């Protein structure tokens, strides 16, 4: 182009074209952004004034210049179609710049337009306006691929992770929680309830320690029966075993109740979750069997050392065992700390018999500790007392 043509173009566009205008939003034909009507009206008035001041020769020059620019653009080697976007090299220091978070802008009229009106744009104008997103430029496809891979790996790890093994609580904890607390008593977590329970248990055992000799002496003195004459060791052992049959009654009763509880609560699986209503009877039966073995083993040994007048203690100790086990069973099922009373009535006679046997074995008759000789009733000093023995008459 010639110099007069370029000067005419600059005069038409005005000095505003020298400054870099900000990027305009994409607006279809016939639509204008809000706030631009006033600017365009002012520009139109200024252009009218300038055009009126110009000479007609300048107008002709501008028209010729526009035609020449169109002709030159038509002769360029590339067409009017959309050009492929070539990757531009990143300027230095581009990666060190952190992208600012996009501010929430009010929706433009293009977003509010329906699809029918948005399709009114010509194809060439739609190709010319390409929206640019800084976030898309900043994040390359390779980085997107890495992020997607990391997210998929995290999901796969979560799916293949084994579930955490839960440790089941011991049955004792479940029973303690299942016990119904009396109304009006609340525990604040200070540990005072545990101390009270311990004091009650100790007090119940102390009560058994006091009542055990009193009950045994009262039954020995006031019950109207006597033991038969048992001069030999074998006869005494047989008498003790026959008395022990009565002591099995609470154990057999506990086994029956345990079987019924298994049927009633459908707890027939041996390795299933234990139920409180079933475990109470099972523990009672197991503990009673253990105490029965220890109790009557010591009672049989005691029968070989007792004199004839004291053989009445054998059935009395047997009855005390049966009654004490029933008391313990009842208090254990209710869940009270007073069950120590029933346990004490079983354990304290057992401990007394053990100490008596040790006393006779090591102090009174150490020569007969491990021998099977007859009782001292067969000795010459005790023959007269044995012959003079007469059962006591009752009332």
Curated annotation (Swiss-Prot):
GO MF annotations, alphabetized: identical protein binding
Membrane topology: Multi-pass membrane protein
Record bears the keyword Membrane: yes
Entry's transmembrane regions: 205-225, 245-265, 291-311, 314-334, 344-364
Key words of the record: Golgi apparatus, Lysosome, Membrane, Transmembrane, Transmembrane helix
Biological-process GO terms, alphabetical: cornification; cuticle development; epithelial cell maturation; establishment of skin barrier; hair follicle morphogenesis; positive regulation of epidermis development; regulated exocytosis
Predominant cellular place of this UniProt entry's protein: other
Protein localization: Lysosome; Golgi apparatus, trans-Golgi network; Membrane
GO CC, alphabetical: lysosomal membrane; trans-Golgi network membrane
Topological domains annotated Cytoplasmic: 1-204, 266-290, 335-343
Extracellular side: 226-244, 312-313, 365-395
Superkingdom assignment: Eukaryota
UniProt region (Disordered), positions on chain: 1-115
Signal peptide start and end residues: none
Function noted in UniProt: Contributes to the epidermal integrity and skin barrier function. Plays a role in the lamellar granule (LG) secretory system and in the stratum corneum (SC) epithelial cell formation.
Protein name as it appears in the record: Transmembrane protein 79
